[in-house]
Amino acid sequence: PWTCFFAEIDAIKEIDFEKELWLDSHGYSALDDQTMFYKAWLRGIKTAVVPDAVYQHLDAKTSTKNNKPAFLYSSVYNRIIFWHRFIFKQQHCFGKVWSVLCIGYRLFWMLLLDIIDLIRNRMTYKELKIKIKAFVDGCRYLHSKEYQKMDLVC
């Protein structure tokens, strides 16, 4: 379930990951692997997956106790930023409309399934509130001066 990667130094430098500090702004860098691989793909850097590789994953804060609130918050917050930065901004008129419909569809089902989990006691009301707050905060960040100053990804 985790990612382990090896890369050439020049390829990592070309990804320019330093410009994605927003990923780690809330104590848990959710979607960092997705962002790294997507930026590599945008730049034409080839990647390969070895599905049967065996390695010992030391820690990426996943083993830290009481980390669930930070994970929930960052997962939703970072997904909104990722969508806007890498999907929405890269599209033309029709693509932008389509990407809004797609993220809306995903968010609708995420909320519906979260409500079902809440009813089935698989999620607490506090956890649902964290996810909703992360969504609102992520949308607000899209309008912030800090976000507006970021370079385009291409």
Feature locations, PLM:
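Catalytic beta-strand/loop signature of glycosyltransferases that borders the donor
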Residues: G44-D59
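Nucleotide-sugar-dependent glycosyltransferase catalytic core
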Residues: G27-S29, Q56-Y77, Y125
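Active-site phosphate/pyrophosphate-handling residues
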Residues: D10, T35, V54
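Nucleotide phosphate-binding site architecture
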Residues: I12-K13, W22, Q56
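Short aromatic/basic micro-patch
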Residues: F6, A30, V49
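Acidic donor-binding loop at a coil-to-helix junction in glycosyltransferase catalytic cores
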Residues: W2, W22-Y38
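Conserved nucleotide-sugar donor-binding
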Residues: T3-D16
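Non-catalytic, C-terminal membrane-associated alpha-helical segments of glycosyltransferases
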Residues: A70-N78, Q91-C154
